Amino acid sequence: MTYLLALDQGTSSSRSIVFDREGRIVAIAQKELTQIYPRPGWVEHDPMEIWHSQLATARDVLAKAKLQPADIHAIGITNQRETTLLWNRKTGQPVHHAIVWQDRRAEPMCAQLRDQGMAATIQEKTGLVIDAYFSGTKLRWLLDNVPGARAQAERGELAFGTVDSWLMWQLTGGKVHVTDVSNASRTMLFNVHRNEWDADLLKALDIPAALMPSVQPSSSHFADTDAALLGRALPIGGVAGDQQSALFGQACFAAGMAKNTYGTGCFLLMHTGGECQPSHNGLLVTSAAQTSATPQYAMEGSVFVGGAVVQWLRDGLKAIKGSAEVQSLAESVPDAGGVMMVPAFTGLGAPYWDADARGTITGLTRGTTVAHIARAALESIAYQSAALLQAMSRDAVAAGGTPVAELRVDGGASVNDLLMQFQADLLGIPVVRPEVIETTALGAAYLAGLSTGVYSDARQLSKLWKVERRFMPTMGRAQAEESMARWERAVRQATAT
């Protein structure tokens, strides 16, 4: 039997999943990751905790699956994107905590870049908007604020990487400093047209080129692991940022196919094939997972606070004791009772891109209960995703394509039937949940399997993808449009300054 090991390093946890060659889950191991909040708007992770937790889950999952290292054909890696690490090449020690994608400390630097007229150049070269979300300004902050970092970087003593690079450095005992195109495309330093680091952007952000990892296609041989770590040297055959990996795991291989991952944030991606189509509706252009040197692209919309709104209900508002309660509480009322929540706790992402927006709850009356607020919180995830898909469809039509015909879904919150049905109602298209919702890890496994001969091509992978449930719209379009209009009014209140 052939098995593939996916290392899935996420924002809230490190996980490892073993899949068989049919894409079925054999075993899962998980360890929570400590969230560090030094100041309001700052979010960090301990790089050594990232590494040790990921290695521990890899060992745990082999034990759970009752497999030997020799049973694993290849390893695939998928990871939280944009999170920025800087470490010493000689010692392998990080010079600072990892700055997480949610972190907003680099916003003043982004404002300077906008004032310098860099917005159009950065969007044209990278497909991204100037935002503290991406790695480039986080890296610049580290160079400017960690004592001695800039001098060390200019001497070639430091290495920059996103989480995938950091894990591969550790997995190989410091032998490789590499990333894949999908992760590189999220740095605001990578030219998505030329598939290489952009010298002009590195210069504009005052980042030494010696810091940067080499870049490979997502499905390729990156390295072999140090045999001492897992009992045998195993090939790392696939690497992709979590959202591009999920797009691949959802078998969205053709232009116009789209998926939404409902995790800490929500991430909606539509494959655009070999065309690097610009967005005119506030969306990002990004590199999709590549299986060869030929570029592939996707359009992306990012929601900063998706499932995290449920965590806030539990930990911040103390409205629920556990995340599992939210569906039953929300279902105890027929609707949100006029309550609308905009969870802009860290600003708003696409298609609004307002770093100064703050969370609001509107429509409160004496009759409002905690159940109405819970339902409004859940519905806010669907509203944000619907705004993204509508923007995406407008871009697709403008480029001569057609609106998205169905939305494939995955991630932890996709198991919530109430949320999925409301999503279908707002969109007016089927929302399709696959049998395996661990599509982020599955995508990494597929990429590794492709490069090592387990699979022959994307056609074979498409046949493995199976539907668990299809949610059909039941709400009339007039009602859905009125609901979206109410959402946009609430957003305007959240973004008012």
From Swiss-Prot:
Similarity remark: Belongs to the FGGY kinase family.
Keyword Nucleotide-binding: yes
Binding-site positions, sn-glycerol 3-phosphate: T11, R81, E82, Y133, D242
Keywords on record: ATP-binding, Glycerol metabolism, Kinase, Nucleotide-binding, Transferase
Amino acids binding ATP: T11, S12, S13, T264, G307, Q311, G412
Pfam families assigned to the protein according to its UniProt record, in alphabetical order: FGGY_C, FGGY_N
EC number(s) from the headed UniProt entry: 2.7.1.30
NCBIfam families: glycerol_kin (TIGR01311), PRK00047.1 (NF000756)
Native organism taxonomy: Bacteria, Pseudomonadati, Pseudomonadota, Betaproteobacteria, Burkholderiales
GO biological process: glycerol catabolic process; glycerol metabolic process; glycerol-3-phosphate metabolic process
Metabolic or biological pathway, per its Swiss-Prot or TrEMBL entry: Polyol metabolism; glycerol degradation via glycerol kinase pathway; sn-glycerol 3-phosphate from glycerol: step 1/1
Regulation: Inhibited by fructose 1,6-bisphosphate (FBP).
Alphabetized SUPFAM superfamilies for the sequence: Actin-like ATPase domain (SSF53067)
Name of the protein this chain belongs to: Glycerol kinase
PANTHER family in the cross-refs: GLYCEROL KINASE (PTHR10196:SF69), SUGAR KINASE (PTHR10196)
Organism: Variovorax paradoxus (strain S110)
Coiled-coil ranges (or none): none
